């Protein structure tokens, strides 16, 4: 596997140079935990019904997601019922739910039939004291009792110290080791960047420190407040974290969560890390979540946008016209079919040239225009109308102008 895979991707050869990759410490297998049904739904205005959650869980499983965080059963009776039904489906994915550091929450989770729990306790001094009015001793007591009880119930346990990214490293490691020393148990710890405050370098540092000081597998839960959730998650994985938390389309509070689609495609194409996700399922999954969340996908959104493959400007359209039968990857970093996208669409508008006319005519079944003067006349009309309406033209608008010349 390298920077160029026939029919799949063609990225920079620099991405795979030994001097670039020499310090990578990716795990042997990267796990993807999707939290669309919990953290994604926390975006104001997004409400998933039981039917929505079950349908999305099925699509996540079909896409190969390894773990599904199906929600928080204490939120409502419907959420608990949705989690129970998802657990009854026999999906390949492991099903987790989100709980507080309260013993009764573990009983509710167990009754839902989940494989594991994600137990939240504040992980920074400011959140403990300012948000909970707790001291370190109380936090350790609550977390150790909750994690121990969850383990005794046969549940896998991910400890989720919120706001960990803004914690002092000594404070965080004291909390985590204190939980273990007090008899608590967790199978992994999430490095939680609740407010999207990590740089990639900061995340990598804290992953390494957690592995060194606590010795438990690390998961990466990052947000998009500075637009860096994907590179920061990759930095955490490169530093030894084994699991990435994501949402479909990046939905979530404030600027959202780490989006599934560009993360897994970047890992595959730019870093040679196959997560096992079925990339050709990404577009359908994205559309399903967009429809059920009521939040449309921007047309230029990475990987799943509707206008990623195609051109209006004349120069790249000309390049495509000449190269499409040689190798489509000359004009794109990964093949459109890899993610379930349709073939490139040629638009026509203010910035278009003769190649656009030729390819749009071909697509619409219109006769080629051999007379160059007629092509120029048609383009003049196209540009005038495009400027007037401030967009590229519809097929109907173009056909009308075509027949005029």
Residue ranges and their predicted role:
Residues 46, 72-73, 95, 99, ...:
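Hydrophobic alpha-helical scaffolding
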Residues 3-6, 43-67, 85-89, 103-216, ...:
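Alpha/beta enzyme core
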Residues 195-325:
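Catalytic alpha/beta core domains of metabolic enzymes, predominantly
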Residues 1-103, 345-348, 352, 358, ...:
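N-terminal capping/small domains of soluble enzymes
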Residues 94, 118, 243-246:
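Short hydrophobic alpha-helical runs that function as membrane-insertion/retention elements
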Residues 2-36, 272-405:
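A mid-to-C-terminal "edge-of-domain" accessory segment
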Residues 48-51, 55, 77-81, 104, ...:
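Conserved active-site and cofactor/substrate-binding residues in soluble primary-metabolism enzymes
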Residues 38, 73-75, 98-102, 122-124, ...:
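Active-site beta-loop-alpha junctions enriched in small/polar residues
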């Amino acid at each position: 596997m390298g920077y160029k895979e026939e029919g799949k991707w063609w990225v920079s050869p620099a991405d795979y140079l030994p001097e670039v990759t020499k310090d990578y410490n990716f795990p042997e297998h990267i796990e993807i935990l999707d939290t669309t049904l919990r953290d994604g739904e926390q975006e104001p205005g997004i409400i998933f019904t039981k039917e929505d959650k079950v349908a999305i869980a099925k699509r996540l499983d079909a896409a190969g997601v390894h773990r599904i965080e199906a929600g928080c059963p204490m939120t409502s009776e419907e959420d608990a019922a949705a989690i129970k039904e998802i657990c009854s489906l026999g999906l390949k994915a492991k099903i987790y739910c989100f709980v507080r550091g309260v013993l009764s929450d573990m009983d509710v989770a167990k009754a839902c039939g989940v494989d594991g729990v994600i137990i939240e306790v504040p992980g920074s001094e400011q959140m403990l004291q300012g948000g909970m009015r707790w001291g370190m001793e109380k936090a350790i007591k609550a977390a150790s009792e909750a994690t121990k009880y969850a383990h005794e119930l046969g549940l896998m346990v991910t400890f989720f110290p919120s706001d960990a990214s803004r914690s002092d490293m000594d404070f965080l490691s004291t909390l985590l080791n204190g939980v273990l020393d007090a008899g608590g148990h967790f199978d992994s710890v999430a490095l939680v960047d609740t407010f999207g405050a990590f740089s990639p370098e900061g995340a990598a540092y804290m992953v390494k420190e957690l592995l060194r000081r606590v010795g438990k597998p690390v998961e990466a839960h990052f947000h998009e407040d500075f637009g860096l959730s994907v590179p920061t998650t990759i930095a955490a994985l490169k530093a030894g974290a084994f699991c990435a938390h994501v949402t479909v389309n990046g939905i979530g509070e404030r600027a959202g969560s780490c989006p599934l689609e560009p993360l897994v495609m970047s890992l595959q194409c730019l870093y040679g890390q196959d997560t096992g996700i079925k990339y050709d399922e990404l577009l359908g999954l994205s559309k399903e979540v967009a429809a059920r969340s009521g939040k449309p996908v921007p047309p230029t959104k990475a990987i799943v946008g509707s206008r990623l493959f195609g051109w209006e400007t004349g120069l790249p359209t000309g390049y495509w016209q000449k190269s499409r039968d040689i190798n489509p990857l000359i004009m794109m970093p990964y093949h459109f079919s890899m993610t379930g996208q349709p073939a490139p669409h040629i638009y026509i508008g203010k910035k278009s040239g003769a190649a656009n006319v030729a390819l749009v005519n071909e697509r619409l079944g219109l006769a080629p225009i051999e007379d160059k003067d007629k092509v120029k006349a048609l383009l003049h009309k196209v540009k005038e109308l495009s400027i007037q309406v401030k967009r590229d033209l519809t097929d109907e608008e173009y056909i009308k102008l075509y027949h005029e010349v």
